[in-house]
């Protein structure tokens, strides 16, 4: 069995620059085709699953946030308006009857 030398053997190892992708591709050739295709299929299905879960999560968050905004915003606005009216009535009462009336009403409420 004779060894055949080519030009690649004359290049020193310190001058060979290969990327990580090239190195992984070269290492992948040492595994059987069945194993490589199984790993490739598993990775593809995993990526598909993660994309699906991400898309479902985005849609769910959008539906929940817009629904809660539509449902609770009128309540929040009405409560704020009611609190403002109560504050205005208390201020008017204080102006008309003096500070003691406002304190007395606060104790009874």
Curated annotation (Swiss-Prot):
Keyword Transcription regulation: no
Pfam families in the cross-refs: Tom22 (PF04281)
Lineage of the organism: Eukaryota, Metazoa, Ecdysozoa, Nematoda, Chromadorea
Topological region Mitochondrial intermembrane: 78-109
GO CC annotation: mitochondrial outer membrane
Cytoplasmic side of membrane: 1-60
Gene knockout outcome: RNAi-mediated knockdown results in impaired mitochondrial homeostasis with the up-regulation of the mitochondrial unfolded protein chaperone hsp-6 and impaired daf-28/insulin secretion.
Main location per the UniProt record: mitochondrion
Annotated source species: Caenorhabditis elegans
Protein name: Mitochondrial import receptor subunit TOM22 homolog
Complexes and interactors: Forms part of the preprotein translocase complex of the outer mitochondrial membrane (TOM complex).
Bilayer topology annotation: Single-pass membrane protein
């Amino acid at each position: 069995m004779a060894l055949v030398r080519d030009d690649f053997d004359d290049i020193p190892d310190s001058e060979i620059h290969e990327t990580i992708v090239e190195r992984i591709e070269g290492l992948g050739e040492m595994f059987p085709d069945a194993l490589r295709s199984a790993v490739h299929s598993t990775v593809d299905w995993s990526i598909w699953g993660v994309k699906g879960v991400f898309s479902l999560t985005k849609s769910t968050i959008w539906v929940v946030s817009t629904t809660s905004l539509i449902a609770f915003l009128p309540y929040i606005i009405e409560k704020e308006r009611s609190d403002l009216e109560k504050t205005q009535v208390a201020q008017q009462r204080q102006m008309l009857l003096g500070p003691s009336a406002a304190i007395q009403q606060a104790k009874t409420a």
